[in-house]
Curated annotation (Swiss-Prot):
Protein name as annotated: Adenine phosphoribosyltransferase
Similarity field: Belongs to the purine/pyrimidine phosphoribosyltransferase family.
Keywords assigned: Cytoplasm, Glycosyltransferase, Purine salvage, Transferase
Gene3D superfamilies: 3.40.50.2020
Primary gene name: apt
EC number: 2.4.2.7
Biological classification of the source: Bacteria, Pseudomonadati, Pseudomonadota, Betaproteobacteria, Burkholderiales
Pathway field: Purine metabolism; AMP biosynthesis via salvage pathway; AMP from adenine: step 1/1
Length: 184
């Protein structure tokens, strides 16, 4: 038996759910990655080992609602840096800044506590998946409103056919993803 790359190993543990949430959609379910402690460790270590490098080490990790919280909090803990949640509108109790972005049908708004980061902070922005890139772009804009620098965006899964990773890179945001899936 040959050794698997981390990417291939993780890919084997991502469940594809056909026709969910709508006909024709291939939903990439990351919950099996989280359920198995060995697989979860490999997943977290893949991010932690990258960001332990001094040149890539963030001051803060920001996680996007909601699965970005799971990844971001653990990665921040392992790197011994702070974690800040970027939430859907109306979920944070203190003074916030907000950013609205377009969805396929309508729009959504995310927000961040106004004191979540300091000017000049280097932030790693993390989520589970990049599809259209709208949520990550909104998170980047929020952090920049507060004077932080988003040094990189990270996700487990990239769905390149939906164009999000290309749009994010075109905006100047470097990306690190672990598993690319064609098709959506």
């Amino acid at each position: 038996m040959t050794a698997l790359s981390v990417n291939d190993y993780l890919r084997q543990h991502i469940r594809t759910v056909p026709d969910w949430p709508a006909p024709g959609v291939q939903f990439r379910d990351i919950t099996p990655l989280l359920q198995n402690p060995k697989v979860f460790r490999v997943l977290i270590d893949a991010f932690v080992h990258r960001y332990m490098d001094r040149a890539l080490r963030p001051d803060v990790v920001a996680g996007l609602d909601a699965r970005g919280f799971i990844l971001g909090a653990v990665v921040a803990y392992e790197l011994n840096v702070g974690f800040v949640p970027i939430r859907k509108k109306g979920k944070l109790p203190f003074t916030t800044v907000e950013e609205t972005y377009e969805l396929e049908y309508g729009s959504a708004t995310v927000e961040l506590h106004a004191d979540a980061v300091q000017p000049g902070d280097r932030v790693l922005l993390i989520d589970d998946l990049i599809a259209t890139g709208g949520t990550m772009m909104a998170g980047k804009k929020l952090l920049e409103k507060l004077g932080a620098t988003v040094m990189e965006g990270a996700a487990i899964v990239d769905l390149p056919e939906l164009g999000g990773s290309e749009r994010l890179r075109a905006s100047g945001l470097p990306l690190y993803t672990l598993v690319d899936f064609s098709g959506h």
